[in-house]
Amino acid sequence: MHLELLFAALVGSASLASGGAVLPQCSPATPIQWGPCPSDLPKDVQCAQYKVPIDYSKPNGEMTTLAAIRKKSESPKPKGSVFLNPGGPGTSGIQAVLSILPGSQPSKILAEYDLLGVDPRGVGQSTPIKCDPAIWNKRVPTLVYNEAQFDAMVQHWKEAGESCRRLTGPLLDFMDTKNVARDFEQLRQAVGESKFNFIGLSYGSQIGYTYAEMFPSNVGRMALDGIVDHTKPRVYAVEAEANTLETTLHRFIDWCGNNKTCALHNNTDIAGLIKRLAAEAEVSPIPAPKCEQSGDLPCQSNVNREDFLAGIQGGLILKTGMPPYQPGWSELAEYLLAAGKGDASGLSAHYYVGETDTTGDFASLAVGCQDWEHAKGFADLHAIEDMTIVFAPLTLGITQSLSYVTRCVAWSTPLKNPQQPIRQSIADTPEILLVNSFWDPAASVQWAVSIREQIPNSSLIFRHGSGHTSYGLNGDTSKAMNAFLLKGKTPADGTTFES
């Protein structure tokens, strides 16, 4: 979900039913005007800004600006365009395109297609969500044990949401994934494509199948990797992500035991170390002396229990990391070893320094609070958290799914796009390719199977490995995705690749 996938170290880094009244039709999209990018960007890309309605029920009302980038195909006669979304919510499509390395599997799309990256509404170089960083830097526990703690959490995130509303304006009310899908439909028309070709990673998978449900006749080739299931109730979402995180953590522990390069190789009880440090951080946050509250990677001066556990999930995203922006398993082991010695800098949470946020966290919560069901009160949340700890005794369910259940209880915009089964309109699309690794710390293979069952014209392939998404790893799974995108070759449903 909101966990940045890096294609290179250049960057630090789904409403399934349309429902409700039929929206007024927008006028045919005006063509997008591509032009030069800023001088600090590569010469082989073009940039554009494009205005879309904030509220599609008022197509002639207030507009918001989307920023986009295009990397031209190597072919003199390209087949068209492929849109790339790296997930989040809140992650930049522009940065994803810029970070693709020559010779990598993602770069091979350029043999036959232009590659387009868009910063979705509220994100990055598009008109951004703005919030008060001072409020966001206050850390209030979301694992609550009594009514007073619950009330404190609700009040904190109510104030955070109100700050976002005050600084952002009406855009905050229209951040749900249906509106993101409508934006992509406007851009498809503006670019002049008859079909929407799309690579969606992580949360991008939710954008993809939401678009396919809303505009089935416009779908071209669509590959979705690291599947998010936005069709089941909140308890299912929290428990599935908690379980896949916990399972992946145990894979990491086994890897350390079998790999002499792991900094914790000689530790015979890594699970015990994690439990001890989490308990200590709950009582007294662990210092993070290497963190500064400024610069390119500002982070908190200490690490509480939830920061510590969230940092572990972040370290499991890529088995081979790209530090300092994205740690891998080796770095995670080093961070845990250092934390055991009193320095948890490597696991510290982001420190917010401005009204706009480079991590995408502001936009992520703005989307999540409109897309995902919230806890109905203290008793409901306490039951969910108690149940989750059974599935995840080490990580305690500290995941993005839980953050939406907790932080959104009193958010300043209503739930607009709650989970529900995919509508049957999606049966009218061409073949859609779904991809998941077996041990993804943020996107459960259980989610992928659920979505496969709801999209008749889909095939689900697996990577026999760990980590969040597969496309950027340049293995056989990436090659299979490209064979589908470039040639229309669909692997047999259920195929498993080793890389």
Predicted regions and their residues:
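Fungal secretory targeting signals
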Residues: M1-A21
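Gly/Pro-rich cap/lid or specificity-loop segments adjacent to the active site
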Residues: A21-D307, A366-V367, W372-S499
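Secretory-pathway/luminal and periplasmic proteins that interact with or process carbohydrate-rich
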Residues: V283-A288, K319-M322, T359
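An accessory alpha-helical subdomain
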Residues: Q300-S301, I312-T320
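Acidic catalytic loop of the alpha/beta-hydrolase fold
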Residues: L318-M322, W439-A442
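Glycine-rich, aromatic-lined ligand/substrate-binding cores of catalytic
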Residues: P327-L332, G340-A344
